[in-house]
Regions:
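Short amphipathic alpha-helical "interface-anchor" segments enriched in bulky aromatics
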Residues: 192-231, 235, 239-246
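Acidic, His- and aromatic-enriched active-site or binding-groove loops in soluble protein domains
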Residues: 13-22, 54, 92-111
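Short, conserved catalytic/metal-binding motifs centered on acidic residues
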Residues: 1, 31, 72-81, 102, ...
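Acidic, metal-coordinating catalytic cores used for nucleic-acid/nucleotide bond scission
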Residues: 74-83, 108-110, 227
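A short, flexible helix-boundary coil/loop motif
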Residues: 243-315
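Active-site-proximal, Lys/Arg-enriched surface segment
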Residues: 1-25
Length: 315
């Protein structure tokens, strides 16, 4: 949100505010940022994304090939439901590199949901689940064919019908919600519910994005020039990754400050424990000493992490 400014590139975004339309790509579950590309606010999510994928996906493949050689799953929201983007990702599959699959939220566009609901209701093969009174859900798979694309792909569909809302109010007409997820993951390894669960993890993307805006204070970018703000975003991604690495290495050991168990720590926590430290500059015996103190709760973790970085040639 950069409303109330005349900054270059600020425009009306799909969320209804004046700002930018950044593209953020993260690798793994810890929030390591592969790219934070700044784009004009009026730009559509999928516009120009092919060029971004040409950089991002091979980068993820190289990182995976240098480690556990794990396959890559590209997870995208409905704004990227595009056959051109799928072809671009398919082109990244080559010998010697980790396999690339994708999971994209389907955009129903002009699908007649009421007509589809009537067809499913008339089909005896449809299996409905009833999680509560006045609500039923059905999930099914269907094969998808894209012109010029030979790789098998399927779409997991879910239709939710409500005749009573969550508060017990009877509805005059049924309410339907149609959702879908397009994927190249094989059904024998990932059933429909597994695909839905995999996509639910996409919510962590918003958590990572909020850390840029709050913890790194990038809610409103500093410059009126678009290129300068794009550089700020690139440097912010670098800073984010450094802080992630410090947090993973320094705040999960037995000597880490006592906190609740977690697989990762927020950037704000990493800065509070390892960056914002009281110190004294001491001149003694023709030497200048930086005294960091040894009695605060993160002193041991800080000393251990500093030693590890020094041995690695970073100190």
């Amino acid at each position: 949100d950069n409303s109330g400014t005349a900054k270059e590139g600020v425009g009306r975004t799909y969320t209804g505010v004046d700002g930018y339309c950044p593209l953020a790509a993260y690798l793994g579950t810890q929030g390591y940022c592969l790219e934070l590309a700044l784009r004009p606010g009026v730009q559509h999510s999928a516009s120009g994304t092919q060029l971004d994928l040409k950089r991002i996906v091979p980068m993820a493949q190289r990182l995976s090939a240098g480690g556990g050689k794990a396959p890559i799953l590209v997870r995208l929201d409905a704004g990227f439901d595009s056959a051109d983007l799928m072809r671009e990702m398919a082109a990244c599959n080559s010998a010697g590199l980790p396999r690339v699959d994708w999971l994209i939220k389907w955009n129903p566009r002009k699908t007649e949901v009421a007509t589809l609901a009537a067809l499913l209701d008339a089909n005896q093969a449809t299996r409905w689940q009833h999680p509560r009174a006045g609500k039923r859900v059905t999930v099914w798979d269907e094969q998808v064919r894209i012109e010029g694309f030979e790789r098998p792909m399927r779409r997991v569909m879910r239709l939710t019908e409500r005749t009573i809302d969550a508060k017990g109010q009877l509805l005059i007409e049924p309410q339907w919600v149609l959702e879908g997820w397009s994927t190249t993951l094989a059904g024998r390894q990932f059933d429909a519910q597994a695909i839905i669960t995999l996509y639910e993890g996409h919510g962590a993307h918003e958590q990572f994005h909020s850390e840029f805006k709050t913890d790194l204070d990038l809610e409103r970018l500093p410059s009126g020039k678009f290129d300068t703000n794009a550089l700020v975003c690139a440097l912010a991604a670098l800073a984010m990754n450094i802080l992630r690495l410090l947090g993973q290495a320094g705040l999960h050991g037995p000597d880490a400050p006592v906190r609740h168990e977690a697989k990762r720590r927020r950037i704000k926590t990493v800065m509070q424990e390892l960056i914002y430290r009281a110190a004294r500059l001491i001149d003694h015996g023709r030497r200048r000493i930086l005294g960091l103190g040894a009695n605060d709760r993160s002193a041991q973790a800080f000393a251990r992490l500093h030693g590890q970085l020094a041995l690695a040639g970073c100190g």
